[in-house]
Swiss-Prot record:
This is Glutamine-dependent NAD(+) synthetase. The lineage of its organism: Bacteria, Pseudomonadati, Pseudomonadota, Gammaproteobacteria, Lysobacterales. Residues 5-247 form the CN hydrolase domain. The gene is nadE. Pathway: Cofactor biosynthesis; NAD(+) biosynthesis; NAD(+) from deamido-NAD(+) (L-Gln route): step 1/1. Keywords: ATP-binding, Ligase, NAD, Nucleotide-binding. Residues 269-545 are annotated as: Ligase.
């Protein structure tokens, strides 16, 4: 019986749908774990073969058949090491979320996930079934009894307890758990509790990378049999974790182990958004991006994110001044581009705007200017930016934040134009926090202080500020956090100290702008309740409450 078991944990990105490429990479990583790291066991994240979440690809028989062929090929290439690989298994008319144990050229065992999440961003019950006969997977490597669970299984006490009853003392848990604020602390507390309940040691491996609106943070850990959580991998980093499990003490000794000092929430959110932009571009064939730069804080923050994600040479900023654009706005945009080394172009919207006014003039005769003319300016900018991306290639990043998406303070087919929205899940007050944080952590000034300290304005009419139409952002975001993120009622929000008239005004804006959000570009989820797949409200909705 061996004193230790060496485990290689593959915290890498496995793109959705790239079955053949993922299979090739898994085989290469298995060989690397065996030959370079001397591992006895190598584990891969949940559904690593298909990527997570594959969504309705799982309804395509050809996709599932491709996965079956690929897992057999991986098994045939696995020798001198045990590999645990996640994939979607088709069995007749049903599909299971599984992790297979591969050894000596074949599939030795297959564990089927017991707990299928069907809340927030997860809808696994749409695709997967639970094995009616139950599922338990325990195997021995060098005399050590090892169990397997998958992600959500660990959030319930019974699956781990049952696996330990089956003889496991070390449990491997592949995951695909997306990032959100505060999740690390919640997860670590849960892992510690499960280990203390059972005395089992846990190797918790999470996938890393952006997938549309989801960003998986990795941040994998190991937990000893006494419930001590050992951070093992940097968040949002592609890397190996190699540890020796010391059986006599039920603890882990690091071989390849990255320990980070405590990371702030702002730092994690920044990494999530940067990784979201980076991977969305890479996985959809974009090497460069465009940003409409107004001299305001939202577009300035998006520009800094884009530079961190892709590099300054892959980012082009565009000023689009109008008759209402302050000279300070133009100057601040130029200052930021100079500081970051970003190419800056300028296209005045006045000719386009004037042309639209002239074309519509006969129909608008005798009517006072209103939001229509303001929106024409925004749509003029959208047309120009989309034309530049269309002509020269690249992805247009839209610059709206969560506060604006919530209350509709954005122009559909105007400033909402673009393919990805980096700030979609970040409230305006958090935009200011992130801008100040980004400036503190770099010698290069990312966002000019003048941008941060000036009153926010859309500059669509003379002397305009956001607070002409909206409550102060600290009030607005407080109400939105309660209503959107926490699903609190009007009465609860008023009881929290907000004026009834302001609450009614804000809640009505949220309700009547659902149609805009349904047409918004995707953006990285960083909160517990993001707009998109986890907040599915009807557009036609008579409920008030």
């Amino acid at each position: 019986m061996s004193e230790f078991l060496r485990i290689a944990m593959a915290q890498f990105d496995f793109p959705v749908g790239a079955v053949a490429q993922n299979a090739e990479r898994i085989i290469a990583l298995i060989e690397q774990a065996r030959d370079e790291h001397g591992a006895d066991v190598v584990m891969f994240p949940e559904l690593a073969l298909s990527g997570y979440p594959p969504e309705d690809l799982l309804l395509r028989p050809g996709f599932l058949a491709h996965c079956q062929v690929a897992i057999e090929r991986i098994a045939a290439a696995t020798h001198g090491i045990v590999a645990v690989v996640g994939w979607p298994q088709s069995a007749g008319s049903v599909v299971y979320n599984v992790a297979s144990v591969l050894c000596d050229g074949q599939v030795e065992q297959t564990y089927r996930k017991r707990e299928l999440p069907n809340y927030a961003v997860f809808d696994e019950r749409r695709y997967f079934e639970v094995d009616p006969n139950g599922s338990r997977c325990v195997f021995k490597v060098k005399g050590v009894p090892v169990g397997v669970l998958i992600c959500e299984d660990l959030w319930f006490s019974e699956p781990l307890a049952d696996t330990v009853c089956g003889g496991a003392e070390l449990v491997l848990v592949p995951n695909a758990s997306p990032y959100e604020r505060g999740k690390h602390a919640q997860r670590d507390a849960l892992l510690a509790e499960r280990a203390r309940e059972t005395g089992a040691a846990i190797a918790y491996l999470n996938v890393v990378g952006g997938q549309d609106a989801l960003v998986f943070d990795g941040a994998s850990v190991v937990v000893d049999g006494h419930g001590r959580v050992h951070p093992a991998a940097a968040a949002f980093s592609d890397q190996w974790l190699v540890v020796d499990y010391m059986r006599s003490e039920r603890r882990f000794v690091p071989l390849q182990w990255v320990v980070e000092s405590e990371v702030s929430i702002n730092a994690l959110v920044w990494r999530a958004v940067v990784r979201g932009v980076q991977d969305y571009c890479r996985k959809n064939g974009f090497s460069k991006v465009w940003v409409g730069l107004s001299g305001g804080i939202d577009s300035a923050l998006v520009l800094a994110i884009a530079v961190d994600a892709l590099g300054a040479d892959q980012v082009t900023a565009v000023r689009l001044p109008s008759r209402y654009t302050a000279e300070l706005s133009n100057d601040l945009a130029a200052e930021q581009c100079h500081s970051l080394g970003v190419r800056l172009e300028t296209v005045a919207i006045e000719p386009v705007f004037e042309g639209l006014l002239a074309a519509l003039g006969p129909l608008f005769a005798g009517m006072a200017p209103d939001a229509t003319e303001e929106n024409l300016q925004s749509r003029s900018r959208g047309v120009i930016l989309m034309a530049l991306a269309n002509k020269f290639g690249g992805l247009l990043l839209t610059t709206g934040n969560k506060s604006e998406y919530a209350v509709g303070y954005a122009t559909i087919y105007g400033d909402m134009c673009g393919g990805y929205a980096p700030l979609k899940d970040i409230y305006k007050s958090q935009v200011f926090e992130l801008a100040q944080w980004r400036n503190r952590v770099s010698d290069v000034l990312a966002i000019p202080p003048g941008v941060i300290h000036r009153p926010p304005s859309a500059e669509l009419r003379a002397q305009q500020t956001d607070q002409d139409s909206l409550p102060p952002y600290e009030v607005l975001d407080g109400i939105l956090s309660l209503y959107v993120d926490q699903e609190q009622s009007r009465e609860d929000i008023i009881a929290a100290g907000y004026a009834a008239g302001v609450v009614d005004y804000v809640l009505n804006l949220v309700r009547i702008n659902e149609w805009k959000r349904h047409q918004a570009a995707p953006g990285p989820k960083v909160s517990q309740r993001a707009f998109g797949r986890e907040r599915r409200y009807p557009i036609s909705n008579a409920y008030r409450g």
